[in-house]
Amino acid sequence: MSDFSLTLVLQFKTSKIINGMANISIKSQKITPFGGIFHVMEKFDHYIGPVVDGELGLRCTTFGYQYSEITRSLMSVYFCGGDCVEDVTSHLMPHLSLHPTLRTCSSDTILRGIKELSTTNTTYTSETGRSYDFNTAVRLNRLLVKILVSTGQLVAGNSYDLDFDHQFIETEKYDAKMTYKKFTGYSPGVAVIGDLIVGIENRDGNANVRFHQQDTLERIFSNLESDDIHVRRARMDCGSCSREIVETIEKHCEHFYIRANRCSSLYDNLLALRGWKREVINGIEYELNSIITEKWEGKAYRLVIQRERRMDGEQDLWEGEYTYRCILTDDYTSTPREIVEFYNLRGGKERIFDDMNNGFGWARLPKSFMAENTVFLLLTAVIRNFYKFLMERLDTKAFGLKKSSRIKAFVFKFISVPAKWIRTARHYVLNIYTDNSSYQNPFTLADG
């Protein structure tokens, strides 16, 4: 904010009430209730904007909007409490356009930009002759990782733990297909490092999760490695338990941990096992064991087994009095307890999908076709990663927030503050009407 300054206006007034009603005075000044958004817009323009335009190129050379401005306008929708792209024109434009230099584009421009960034679907044909569409969006996936590296959220040369899963998004778009969950939609594969989304590939909702998953993972791993980001450990559910997928994962990480799918031949070995060790994990008593098994011909891996006694007392045809869960891994040094506890951390990643659905628009996709909606998924992933970047640097206690707070709380606690732009001494000043002096410098950033 080198061209602007901030003034905190601390006001304490009492209203005189006559006949049960407060006196009301109408002022025509341009005061916005979203005063905190201008901080966010400027940080986005400083940290994210140059990377977006550098990777995607200039959209125009004269008076049109660049892709960084389109992305920032889309960001402002969710940072001001909106839930669909049209909110920027219907409700937010009078407030966002108050910024003296940063332009905000209309919802029509955002949607045109999304269409321009879309790429053609890739069609794969199964052995049975059925065709399934995938959308890889290579350029935007590259942008997603480059932004994380530029903000320091990922550090080149470091190794991280990666989670991969498919998220089923319910929608009734033109090309949405019926999923096994009995609703129409898409089933994008999403890769996550920590609390950050690092890769998304969209696919037809009726495609089996294992179908060409190894190709998706190969592209995600290669994209990370192109920026010198490496995977130390990978966690995945039973949808990734196939020979082709495991061989791909092995090439790109030190260790993998995959939920093994159940089969009758495996239970014969489990029931004959001895030497179970009792462990209490998260308040639940389990019995743990591990064996070396030849999951596929010529491929032996470690199988970590946990079993829990059935509470209802009934016996299953295959499992007997226990419920069995298995983890396939190439980690031969960690104890069974360490492996189970590490794999269980994967459950926390579901919060990310819930956050995207409810806070960043995944529940209300804006376009009619998968290729364009894939662009939207990736742009909102960029926006959420930027939100996590801000929250790590925000003085959260000063605003009654936590580092893990959802964006709805951020809107209420930080964005929603009265403010007014004024021009004085040949430069612009943002007056913020609050008694919270932390607005003077809320973010711990290198540029202040």
What function would you assign to each model-found segment?
Residues 363-394, 398-426:
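Basic, amphipathic alpha-helical segments enriched in Lys/Arg and hydrophobic/aromatic residues
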Residues 22, 255-358, 445-448:
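An anionic, glycine-rich sequence signature occurring as long contiguous blocks
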Residues 2-183, 189-206, 213-227, 416-448:
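Dynamic "connector" segments at or just before major functional cores
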